[in-house]
UniProtKB/Swiss-Prot annotation:
Membrane topology listed for this record: Multi-pass membrane protein
Protein known as: Probable K(+)/H(+) antiporter subunit C
Places the protein is found: Cell membrane
A matching Pfam family: Oxidored_q2
GO biological process: potassium ion transport; proton transmembrane transport
Organism per entry: Rhizobium meliloti (strain 1021)
Role: Part of a K(+) efflux system which is required for the adaptation of R.meliloti to alkaline pH as well as for the infection process during symbiotic nodule development.
Transmembrane segments: 4-21, 28-47, 75-97
């Protein structure tokens, strides 16, 4: 499980960095989203991935705390997903406004020349 998760995090990070270095704004936004997903998976993985382990305590008593998973990374990831969605929507609006003003979607506002 850890090997698959770390391979997924590495793939998302590499793809995100590659897209961040591209000259078009839309690719940069997708790269930021992929990096956000990689960080979310990393935080989620640090919270002890367990199958059938509730993140809340039983009302009958505490018992053994090793049976429970940590709820804080789950709450952080859920919050990060919502904030990431809002930031992506904001970036897309800024992209559309920039394209309307400059007529291009390049990051620096200029078309690349084929010299």
């Amino acid at each position: 499980m850890e090997l698959i998760l770390s391979a997924g995090i590495g793939t998302l990070t590499a793809s995100g960095v590659y897209l961040l270095l591209r000259p078009r704004t839309y690719q940069v936004i997708i790269g930021l989203s992929l990096l956000s997903f990689a960080v979310n998976l990393f935080i989620f993985g640090m919270g002890r991935l367990r199958v059938n382990a509730p993140p809340i305590l039983d009302p009958g008593g505490v018992g053994d705390l090793a049976r429970y998973t940590d709820p804080v990374p789950q709450a952080l990831v859920l919050t990060a997903i919502v904030i990431g969605f809002a930031m992506t929507a904001l970036f897309l609006v800024v992209l559309l406004a920039s394209r309307g003003f400059t007529g291009t979607d390049h990051v620096d506002g200029r078309e690349q020349r084929g010299d």
